[in-house]
Amino acid sequence: HEGGILEQQMLDVVNEAGASLIGPNCIGLMNMNYHGVFTQPIPEFHPDGVDFISSSGGTALFIIESALTKGLRFSSVWSVGNSKQNGVEDILEYMDRNFDPVLDSKIKMLYIEQIKQPDKLLYHASSLIRKGCKIAAIKAGSTESGKRAASSHTGAIASSDSAVEALFRKAGIVRCFSREELTTVASIFTLKDVKGKNCAIVTHAGGPAVMLADALSKGRLNVPSLEGPIADELKSKLYPGAAVGNPIDIIGTGTPEHLATAIDFCENRFDNVDLMMVIFGSPGLVKLYDTYEVLHKKMEECKKPIFPILPSIVTAGPEVKSFVKKGHVNFSDEVTLGTALSRVINTPKPMSTDIQLYGVDVPEVRRIIDRLPGSGYLNPEEVRTLLRAANIPLVEEYASDDRDALLAFAKKVKYPVVAKVVGPVHKSDIGGVALNIRGEEHLLFEYERMMRLPGVTGIMVQPMLKGQELFLGAKYEDRFGHVVLCGLGGIFVEVLKDVSYGLAPLSYDETYSMIRSLRGYPIIKGTRGQKGIDEQQYADIIVRLSTLLRFASEIKEMDINPLVATDRGLFAVDARIRIEK
């Protein structure tokens, strides 16, 4: 309490003077002109170093330690502590508004404990990235909110962390989960831009190359096979026993000249290589100063980026230090690098925040929402009216407590049909769903059984659609807005939690990026002789849903589960919407 009063008094003095306050409860500010701090380490400062903003002072120091072991240099360090006047978002705004493309660093690292102003972070991060910057960030404290109980599939899957994930994707920020990963991603940013996903691994030791190839493949990058006359020619220039299939293993007795030859072939002769990763430690068979000099020259000459993995930081400490002193970074662990690189390459570019209005009747959406009497779950007819206003195709259905009317409808749409109870929200929990009803007697039996269940006011009948089940949902997060989720339905969403997140409103680019980042995407595309689904229509529905949400902030939770992809197109079969007014 006393500390809070002193903090407020300090802020009042600063505001009266028209000054800026960083902190309190922080290690302060360091840059090329000033590092009057009481902590260690103080890194080297260079104009082309990294700008680093941290919520925590202690963590900032540990991140600097991790960066220094890689040869990463700094341009400025900001520790915002309690953020009484300026938080991480405010420092980013300052950097964006005063950005000088010639003088300022283009690499930003963020360690964030709380996102108080998501809109500000989104706006200035994406603005800086569009100006040519690259941003990597850790958002700490990502699991606590996930423990909250929630009533829908969407609520159970979408924690506050999904909002962070969606925000970072929309802004184009590379999300990291540890100090080591953050400083590895920032080190990747210092190298030449990666133009593709095809990686060549050049090594003199088999094991690390295999582990690196595994890490790259898991991260959806390619380690293409190198074969044919060009590969044979390269093999003829190396010692017997060398392998060139990728990894290119020049073996333990390989010389600096062999390394140079392998790099030249990857740069000039192999068209299916976009970047090179060179693993070279100290087997004690060649002079490492000579080898690292070759690597230094090739990194300057080559147009394709080269990632140096020099693992012998103890045995070859002086040689590695000498290499780093020439302005290079070093990745001592190949798997950390492979994982970090996949994060960089799989992070989309900043997305448009324009709203796609096509196909959504916004006045009708508002009329429906404004007419609703209060908070809670909407009844099936209200849900259908709202989805119709957003032009989301619905399965034909009929709800009634009149047995004969239900039988007539089932006859019209043709068996098999599905019957569901009207009333309770969680129908399947009370046995209120019957699938694959093949005839009149079966439907009558289910009608009699279901009408006796507690809280049931009627029965809904739908044709039984055949096709791939998809899932679509949304959840409102304070300050962030609506997080939209998409994925394959059934086991994929419930057990495997294979979902993608986006922040409404969604552009088509962002929506396609969400769909294609799903682990189950090959099923959407069509795999093993099975026909794919209409990806364009799925994207249309997701975009329209995000527009609907943008104009109906009262919707706090919703899911369409399943959305069935049939030969005739996609249809929403079951949907739930909860509003708060």
List each model region and its residues.
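Catalytic-core regions of core metabolic enzymes
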Residues: H1-K581
